[in-house]
Amino acid sequence: MKSNAPTFKVAVSKRSCSSVRKTSKKIRSGMIRKPSVSSRYRKHEGVNLYMSKVTPTSIPAPPQVLVAYIKEKVKTLNKSEVLMSLGNSNQLSSRDVKTKTKKKQINDFIAFRSYYSRLLNGILTQTELSTIISKHWTVDKQTRKNWELIAQEYNCDASGKHFFNWLEVNYGIDKQWLYEIVQYEECLTPTTKKPYVENIYNSGFKQRIDSPNQKDITFSQSDNSADWLVDPIFFDTEFLATSFDRTNLIISDCYSLMNSV
């Protein structure tokens, strides 16, 4: 005869429900221990950035090969246009990245190049800049390390700023070395002396000089050409009145000089 009773008993110990506590996500997030603030830790909005190396406190100095090239290039440029380009470099593409648009990640070389491309806009062409900084990049290890840390920090930043504007806010853009180059080259440029205006009542005469054929040429004989006439008002030094030929005085020129004074 079949029976539904169990043939043996098994003792099963059930875990108490009180030992398992469910916590909400908000509580669990608050229980996470925050890292201690140190020189190797920078806190950004929504991002905790850990650096294995200390980031630079300022933008690294420009390469010497780039400085030397700029000094030679500035000699061929208009100084006022160069100063205007330096003043407008902070105003180019100053818009922030849209919140809906994902910010592009940059590497160390792109960060290095985009900084100098924006800073030297109007001074060097893109071809000149790429040639110079690419050669320096391959040989200078410290430059690569510094810009690698700067690029990593920018990629973890959530402010949504363009790289150059982000550098200006967090590091500051130093243009003093560029202004010093422009002003130094401007001091070396020889200045043109202004014409010396003499008193027309004492020495405002035309001087008659010798012609190539060793004959004196007067104003009437030269077909109204003033190539052989030297006007003393364009001299830097004052001449005595006796050194001019008073017989070659042109009245119309004197009137024009008097009206211009």
UniProtKB/Swiss-Prot annotation:
Domain of life: Eukaryota
GO molecular function: DNA binding, bending
CC terms in the record's Gene Ontology section: nucleus
Annotated PROSITE patterns: ALPHA_BOX
DNA-binding region ranges: 101-158
InterPro entries recorded: MATalpha_HMGbox
GO annotation, biological process: positive regulation of mating-type specific transcription, DNA-templated
Primary localisation category: nucleus
One Pfam family linked to the record: MATalpha_HMGbox
Keyword Transcription regulation: yes
Compartments where located: Nucleus
Keywords recorded for this protein, A-Z: Activator, DNA-binding, Nucleus, Transcription, Transcription regulation
Function description: Mating type proteins are sequence specific DNA-binding proteins that act as master switches in yeast differentiation by controlling gene expression in a cell type-specific fashion. Transcriptional activator that induces the transcription of alpha-specific genes. Required for mating as an alpha-cell.
Remaining remarks: There are three genetic loci for mating type genes in K.lactis. MAT is the expression locus that determines the mating type of the cell, whereas HML (containing HMLALPHA1, HMLALPHA2 and HMLALPHA3) and HMR (containing HMRA1 and HMRA2) represent silenced repositories of mating type information. The mating type is determined by the MAT locus, which contains either a copy of HML or of HMR. Diploid cells are usually heterozygous for the MAT locus.
The family this protein is said to belong to: Belongs to the MATALPHA1 family.
Name under which the protein is recorded: Mating-type protein ALPHA1
Species of provenance: Kluyveromyces lactis (strain ATCC 8585 / CBS 2359 / DSM 70799 / NBRC 1267 / NRRL Y-1140 / WM37) (Yeast)
